[in-house]
Amino acid sequence: MTTNQTDIQNPAAVDLDKVQPKPGLGSNFETAAYPALLFSTKSRVWSDKTPEAIEPTDPAYEGDGLRQKTQVKDGHRCMFCGFYSQQNQVHNLTDNHRDIRPENLRTADPLCHGWQHLGELSEGNAVIAYLPGLSGQDANHLQRTIMIALQSDDVNVREDAKKMLNWMASHRDYTKDAWGTYYPAIFSTALVRLEDREARQVVFEDLAVVFNPGSFAKYASAWARESYRTLPVNKWSQVHHDVMNAPA
């Protein structure tokens, strides 16, 4: 595309009262970049031989290469938060793992996917914490970063990561005070009765899943190689300093 020099104006000479925005400008902000990250659980299907599975186990799923096709279609990015990883999983939009139609399959990173499988999170693997002001996506991005830091060779980095994770997990006490429990599997029983997804967003507002990092050690190693390679842990302190001391 060429630019006509006569179309270029001096910004100082523009009459702001006569400026007309282009039609459709800003319309992209009317739609959220990612869907809301809500609690859900796997649909209970009679004769399901793998009730704890978090991905489809139908032979046709692997036989037809649906897992790989779904990942490629989504560019290996999570539908909920946009995180890129070759280690991402496949989520069934209807929560029914027998439904393996291509349009029902989307890519989800292991943390966001965990939100969709509260009933499959056993005691000790995760808790439900009250974290007001922190979106589910941000809570997962923070936990992912913590999990990578926990594998650092720097003992100070590991200690800081533990403190941050413990702070997040400690907010499970607020959940227990309000709900009587902080176990994901118990919350999943309430989800079965609450089919309205929009209602879930209101009822469970400000609640987040805080995961046990031990279950994600293999993922954390891959995340460090893939998405954090250009920003290794040993540079985080400098980045924090630069951001906090950036000129106004």
Description of each model-found segment:
Residues 58-110, 116-130:
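Histidine-centered nuclease catalytic patch
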Residues 1-56, 114-248:
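Extended charged
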